[in-house]
Amino acid sequence: MTRRALLALPALALRVGRSIDRSRISAITDEVAPTPGEAIRFAQQYGLKWVELRAVPGSKTYYQFLSDDELRAAARELADAGLRVSFLNTGLLKFPMPGTEPVRFRNETPEARAKRLARDQAEFDRRMEDLRKAIRAAHILGTDKIRIFTFTRVADPMALLPRIAEILEPMVAVAERENVRLLVENEGSCNVATCAELAALMKMLPSKHLGINWDALNGTAHGEKPFPDGYQLLPKERIGNVQIKGRSVLQGPQWLDWAAIFQAMARDGYEGCFGLETHIFGPELFQKSHECMREILRIVDSLAPPTSASGGV
Protein backbone atom coordinates (compact mmCIF):
# COMPACT_ATOMS: atom_id res chain seq x y z
CA MET A 1 0.00 0.00 0.00
CA THR A 2 1.34 3.45 -0.91
CA ARG A 3 1.81 6.17 1.68
CA ARG A 4 -0.92 8.22 -0.03
CA ALA A 5 -3.39 5.34 0.18
CA LEU A 6 -2.50 4.75 3.82
CA LEU A 7 -3.10 8.40 4.70
CA ALA A 8 -6.46 8.28 2.93
CA LEU A 9 -7.79 5.49 5.15
CA PRO A 10 -8.95 7.69 8.09
CA ALA A 11 -10.80 10.01 5.70
CA LEU A 12 -12.46 7.03 4.06
CA ALA A 13 -13.51 5.69 7.44
CA LEU A 14 -15.08 9.03 8.33
CA ARG A 15 -16.94 9.14 5.04
CA VAL A 16 -18.40 5.66 5.41
CA GLY A 17 -20.09 6.62 8.70
CA ARG A 18 -21.98 4.38 11.07
CA SER A 19 -24.74 2.01 10.14
CA ILE A 20 -28.38 2.98 10.34
CA ASP A 21 -29.98 1.50 13.45
CA ARG A 22 -32.78 2.24 15.90
CA SER A 23 -30.78 5.03 17.53
CA ARG A 24 -31.19 7.08 14.33
CA ILE A 25 -34.99 6.80 14.03
CA SER A 26 -37.29 9.69 14.96
CA ALA A 27 -40.96 10.62 14.40
CA ILE A 28 -43.04 13.78 14.01
CA THR A 29 -45.04 13.83 17.23
CA ASP A 30 -48.28 15.38 15.95
CA GLU A 31 -48.77 12.52 13.48
CA VAL A 32 -48.27 9.68 15.95
CA ALA A 33 -50.54 10.69 18.85
CA PRO A 34 -53.24 13.21 19.84
CA THR A 35 -51.40 14.66 22.87
CA PRO A 36 -47.77 15.36 23.79
CA GLY A 37 -47.90 12.75 26.55
CA GLU A 38 -49.19 10.05 24.23
CA ALA A 39 -46.55 10.99 21.65
CA ILE A 40 -43.90 10.44 24.32
CA ARG A 41 -45.40 7.04 25.12
CA PHE A 42 -45.32 6.18 21.41
CA ALA A 43 -41.61 7.01 21.29
CA GLN A 44 -40.92 5.03 24.45
CA GLN A 45 -42.88 2.03 23.19
CA TYR A 46 -40.48 1.74 20.27
CA GLY A 47 -37.34 2.66 22.16
CA LEU A 48 -36.81 5.89 20.23
CA LYS A 49 -34.22 8.41 21.39
CA TRP A 50 -35.42 11.25 19.17
CA VAL A 51 -38.59 13.05 18.09
CA GLU A 52 -39.32 15.70 15.49
CA LEU A 53 -41.53 18.60 16.51
CA ARG A 54 -43.95 20.54 14.29
CA ALA A 55 -47.36 21.35 15.78
CA VAL A 56 -48.17 20.56 19.39
CA PRO A 57 -50.04 17.22 19.20
CA GLY A 58 -53.79 17.85 19.34
CA SER A 59 -53.28 21.50 18.40
CA LYS A 60 -52.62 23.53 15.26
CA THR A 61 -50.05 25.69 17.05
CA TYR A 62 -46.49 25.20 15.85
CA TYR A 63 -43.83 24.92 18.54
CA GLN A 64 -42.01 27.99 17.23
CA PHE A 65 -44.94 30.17 18.31
CA LEU A 66 -45.07 28.95 21.91
CA SER A 67 -43.89 31.18 24.74
CA ASP A 68 -40.51 30.66 26.36
CA ASP A 69 -42.15 29.10 29.41
CA GLU A 70 -44.20 26.72 27.25
CA LEU A 71 -41.11 25.73 25.30
CA ARG A 72 -39.10 25.12 28.45
CA ALA A 73 -41.90 22.96 29.84
CA ALA A 74 -42.01 20.94 26.62
CA ALA A 75 -38.23 20.55 26.65
CA ARG A 76 -38.30 19.32 30.27
CA GLU A 77 -41.08 16.82 29.52
CA LEU A 78 -39.08 15.35 26.65
CA ALA A 79 -35.81 15.30 28.58
CA ASP A 80 -37.48 13.59 31.55
CA ALA A 81 -38.64 10.89 29.12
CA GLY A 82 -35.12 10.43 27.75
CA LEU A 83 -35.98 12.04 24.41
CA ARG A 84 -34.15 14.65 22.34
CA VAL A 85 -35.40 16.80 19.47
CA SER A 86 -33.84 15.84 16.15
CA PHE A 87 -35.56 18.48 14.01
CA LEU A 88 -37.87 21.49 14.35
CA ASN A 89 -40.38 21.57 11.50
CA THR A 90 -41.62 25.07 10.67
CA GLY A 91 -43.75 26.42 7.84
CA LEU A 92 -41.24 29.17 7.00
CA LEU A 93 -41.63 30.31 3.37
CA LYS A 94 -44.45 27.86 2.65
CA PHE A 95 -46.63 30.47 0.99
CA PRO A 96 -46.66 32.29 -2.38
CA MET A 97 -43.80 34.71 -2.95
CA PRO A 98 -45.25 38.20 -3.54
CA GLY A 99 -45.10 39.07 -7.22
CA THR A 100 -45.32 35.47 -8.45
CA GLU A 101 -48.22 33.52 -9.91
CA PRO A 102 -48.48 30.11 -8.24
CA VAL A 103 -49.92 27.37 -10.39
CA ARG A 104 -52.31 26.16 -7.69
CA PHE A 105 -54.17 29.50 -7.41
CA ARG A 106 -54.97 30.10 -11.08
CA ASN A 107 -58.74 29.82 -10.63
CA GLU A 108 -59.15 32.23 -7.71
CA THR A 109 -62.01 34.69 -7.54
CA PRO A 110 -60.95 38.37 -7.45
CA GLU A 111 -62.01 38.61 -3.79
CA ALA A 112 -60.09 35.49 -2.77
CA ARG A 113 -57.05 36.68 -4.69
CA ALA A 114 -57.04 40.08 -2.98
CA LYS A 115 -57.24 38.48 0.47
CA ARG A 116 -54.51 35.98 -0.35
CA LEU A 117 -52.16 38.61 -1.73
CA ALA A 118 -52.52 40.68 1.44
CA ARG A 119 -51.95 37.61 3.60
CA ASP A 120 -48.92 36.52 1.58
CA GLN A 121 -47.36 39.99 1.74
CA ALA A 122 -47.82 40.15 5.50
CA GLU A 123 -46.21 36.73 5.95
CA PHE A 124 -43.34 37.70 3.65
CA ASP A 125 -42.76 40.93 5.56
CA ARG A 126 -42.46 39.10 8.89
CA ARG A 127 -40.24 36.27 7.62
CA MET A 128 -37.20 37.41 9.58
CA GLU A 129 -39.25 37.78 12.75
CA ASP A 130 -40.67 34.28 12.26
CA LEU A 131 -37.15 32.98 11.66
CA ARG A 132 -35.97 34.48 14.94
CA LYS A 133 -38.91 32.83 16.73
CA ALA A 134 -37.97 29.49 15.19
CA ILE A 135 -34.33 29.89 16.24
CA ARG A 136 -35.38 30.83 19.78
CA ALA A 137 -37.56 27.71 19.93
CA ALA A 138 -34.79 25.52 18.53
CA HIS A 139 -32.33 26.77 21.13
CA ILE A 140 -34.73 26.08 24.00
CA LEU A 141 -35.68 22.67 22.62
CA GLY A 142 -32.06 21.68 22.10
CA THR A 143 -31.89 21.24 18.34
CA ASP A 144 -29.86 23.08 15.71
CA LYS A 145 -31.90 21.99 12.67
CA ILE A 146 -34.88 24.00 11.39
CA ARG A 147 -37.07 23.20 8.39
CA ILE A 148 -37.83 25.84 5.77
CA PHE A 149 -39.50 25.86 2.34
CA THR A 150 -39.15 27.72 -0.96
CA PHE A 151 -42.52 29.41 -1.60
CA THR A 152 -45.54 28.01 -3.44
CA ARG A 153 -44.63 26.48 -6.77
CA VAL A 154 -44.80 28.49 -10.00
CA ALA A 155 -44.85 27.26 -13.60
CA ASP A 156 -41.06 27.58 -14.01
CA PRO A 157 -39.47 26.97 -10.59
CA MET A 158 -35.87 26.85 -11.84
CA ALA A 159 -36.19 30.39 -13.18
CA LEU A 160 -37.22 31.58 -9.72
CA LEU A 161 -34.38 29.90 -7.82
CA PRO A 162 -31.97 32.88 -8.05
CA ARG A 163 -34.59 35.12 -6.42
CA ILE A 164 -35.25 32.48 -3.75
CA ALA A 165 -31.52 32.28 -3.06
CA GLU A 166 -31.41 36.06 -2.73
CA ILE A 167 -34.19 35.96 -0.12
CA LEU A 168 -32.55 33.08 1.73
CA GLU A 169 -29.12 34.71 1.94
CA PRO A 170 -29.84 37.03 4.90
CA MET A 171 -31.76 34.23 6.62
CA VAL A 172 -28.73 31.97 6.29
CA ALA A 173 -26.55 34.76 7.70
CA VAL A 174 -28.77 34.87 10.79
CA ALA A 175 -28.58 31.07 11.06
CA GLU A 176 -24.79 31.27 10.94
CA ARG A 177 -24.68 33.83 13.74
CA GLU A 178 -27.05 31.70 15.83
CA ASN A 179 -25.22 28.44 15.01
CA VAL A 180 -28.23 26.64 13.54
CA ARG A 181 -28.84 24.98 10.17
CA LEU A 182 -31.80 25.82 7.95
CA LEU A 183 -32.81 22.68 6.07
CA VAL A 184 -34.76 23.14 2.84
CA GLU A 185 -37.42 20.49 2.33
CA ASN A 186 -38.20 19.27 -1.17
CA GLU A 187 -41.97 19.77 -1.03
CA GLY A 188 -44.22 19.00 -4.00
CA SER A 189 -46.25 22.20 -3.66
CA CYS A 190 -43.14 24.40 -3.44
CA ASN A 191 -40.51 25.59 -5.91
CA VAL A 192 -37.97 23.09 -4.66
CA ALA A 193 -39.74 19.74 -4.99
CA THR A 194 -37.16 17.45 -6.58
CA CYS A 195 -33.59 16.46 -5.87
CA ALA A 196 -32.47 18.30 -9.01
CA GLU A 197 -34.00 21.51 -7.65
CA LEU A 198 -32.46 20.91 -4.22
CA ALA A 199 -29.04 20.44 -5.79
CA ALA A 200 -29.40 23.61 -7.87
CA LEU A 201 -30.35 25.73 -4.85
CA MET A 202 -27.54 24.31 -2.70
CA LYS A 203 -25.06 25.24 -5.42
CA MET A 204 -26.26 28.85 -5.31
CA LEU A 205 -25.84 29.04 -1.52
CA PRO A 206 -22.79 27.01 -0.40
CA SER A 207 -23.05 27.89 3.31
CA LYS A 208 -22.85 24.94 5.70
CA HIS A 209 -25.71 26.61 7.60
CA LEU A 210 -28.10 25.83 4.74
CA GLY A 211 -28.80 22.19 4.10
CA ILE A 212 -31.35 19.63 3.00
CA ASN A 213 -34.32 17.95 4.63
CA TRP A 214 -34.78 15.13 2.14
CA ASP A 215 -38.34 13.84 1.95
CA ALA A 216 -37.71 11.04 -0.49
CA LEU A 217 -41.31 10.49 -1.57
CA ASN A 218 -42.13 14.13 -2.31
CA GLY A 219 -40.28 14.29 -5.62
CA THR A 220 -42.51 11.60 -7.12
CA ALA A 221 -45.26 14.20 -7.53
CA HIS A 222 -43.13 15.66 -10.32
CA GLY A 223 -42.07 12.41 -11.95
CA GLU A 224 -38.85 11.90 -10.02
CA LYS A 225 -37.59 8.44 -9.13
CA PRO A 226 -36.30 9.20 -5.61
CA PHE A 227 -33.79 6.39 -5.39
CA PRO A 228 -31.32 5.89 -6.79
CA ASP A 229 -31.88 8.57 -9.46
CA GLY A 230 -32.87 11.55 -7.30
CA TYR A 231 -30.56 10.67 -4.43
CA GLN A 232 -27.54 10.55 -6.74
CA LEU A 233 -28.07 14.24 -7.56
CA LEU A 234 -27.92 15.42 -3.95
CA PRO A 235 -24.79 16.92 -2.40
CA LYS A 236 -24.52 14.31 0.34
CA GLU A 237 -22.66 16.53 2.80
CA ARG A 238 -25.61 18.96 2.80
CA ILE A 239 -28.22 16.43 3.93
CA GLY A 240 -29.12 17.23 7.54
CA ASN A 241 -32.36 15.30 8.01
CA VAL A 242 -34.43 12.68 6.22
CA GLN A 243 -38.18 12.20 6.45
CA ILE A 244 -39.96 8.94 5.72
CA LYS A 245 -43.53 9.13 4.47
CA GLY A 246 -45.70 6.29 5.75
CA ARG A 247 -46.80 5.15 2.31
CA SER A 248 -43.17 4.74 1.30
CA VAL A 249 -42.57 1.98 3.86
CA LEU A 250 -45.90 0.14 3.57
CA GLN A 251 -46.51 -2.12 0.59
CA GLY A 252 -48.28 -0.27 -2.21
CA PRO A 253 -47.67 1.91 -5.27
CA GLN A 254 -45.59 4.47 -3.33
CA TRP A 255 -43.30 1.93 -1.62
CA LEU A 256 -39.58 2.75 -1.66
CA ASP A 257 -36.65 0.44 -0.98
CA TRP A 258 -35.64 1.90 2.37
CA ALA A 259 -33.20 -0.91 3.08
CA ALA A 260 -31.21 0.16 0.01
CA ILE A 261 -31.58 3.85 0.91
CA PHE A 262 -30.34 3.28 4.47
CA GLN A 263 -27.35 1.31 3.21
CA ALA A 264 -26.44 3.93 0.59
CA MET A 265 -26.69 6.79 3.07
CA ALA A 266 -24.55 4.93 5.61
CA ARG A 267 -21.90 4.37 2.93
CA ASP A 268 -22.03 8.05 2.04
CA GLY A 269 -21.40 9.11 5.63
CA TYR A 270 -24.83 10.43 6.59
CA GLU A 271 -24.91 10.90 10.38
CA GLY A 272 -28.39 12.36 10.96
CA CYS A 273 -31.80 10.99 11.85
CA PHE A 274 -34.68 9.56 9.85
CA GLY A 275 -38.07 10.86 10.96
CA LEU A 276 -41.39 9.15 10.33
CA GLU A 277 -43.96 11.53 8.83
CA THR A 278 -46.92 9.18 8.57
CA HIS A 279 -49.11 11.46 6.42
CA ILE A 280 -51.90 8.89 6.02
CA PHE A 281 -54.71 11.13 7.17
CA GLY A 282 -58.10 10.13 8.50
CA PRO A 283 -59.26 8.12 11.50
CA GLU A 284 -56.51 5.56 10.92
CA LEU A 285 -53.62 8.06 11.17
CA PHE A 286 -52.33 6.96 14.58
CA GLN A 287 -52.87 3.27 13.86
CA LYS A 288 -50.91 3.66 10.62
CA SER A 289 -48.13 5.40 12.55
CA HIS A 290 -47.68 2.25 14.62
CA GLU A 291 -47.67 0.08 11.49
CA CYS A 292 -45.13 2.34 9.80
CA MET A 293 -42.82 2.51 12.81
CA ARG A 294 -42.85 -1.26 13.21
CA GLU A 295 -41.90 -1.63 9.55
CA ILE A 296 -39.11 0.97 9.77
CA LEU A 297 -37.64 -0.81 12.79
CA ARG A 298 -37.95 -4.17 11.07
CA ILE A 299 -35.95 -2.80 8.14
CA VAL A 300 -33.17 -1.28 10.25
CA ASP A 301 -32.97 -4.42 12.38
CA SER A 302 -32.61 -6.53 9.24
CA LEU A 303 -29.53 -4.51 8.28
CA ALA A 304 -27.76 -5.00 11.62
CA PRO A 305 -25.18 -7.73 12.20
CA PRO A 306 -26.87 -10.72 13.90
CA THR A 307 -25.07 -10.10 17.20
CA SER A 308 -26.27 -6.48 17.49
CA ALA A 309 -29.78 -6.67 16.06
CA SER A 310 -32.44 -5.38 18.43
CA GLY A 311 -35.41 -7.43 19.48
CA GLY A 312 -38.62 -6.74 17.56
CA VAL A 313 -41.42 -4.64 18.99
Regions found by a protein language model. Name each.
Residues 11-17, 42-44, 80, 93-211:
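Active-site acidic/histidine proton-transfer and metal-coordination neighborhood
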Residues 31-33, 55-57, 91-94, 150-154, ...:
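Active-site-proximal loop/turn and secondary-structure-junction residues that shape catalytic pockets
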Residues 6-10, 20-25, 33-49, 79-81, ...:
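Histidine-acidic metal/acid-base catalytic patches
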Residues 25-29, 182-186, 251:
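Short catalytic-loop micro-motif centered on adjacent basic/acidic residues
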Residues 52, 87-89, 147, 243, ...:
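Conserved beta-strand positions in the central sheet of alpha/beta enzyme cores
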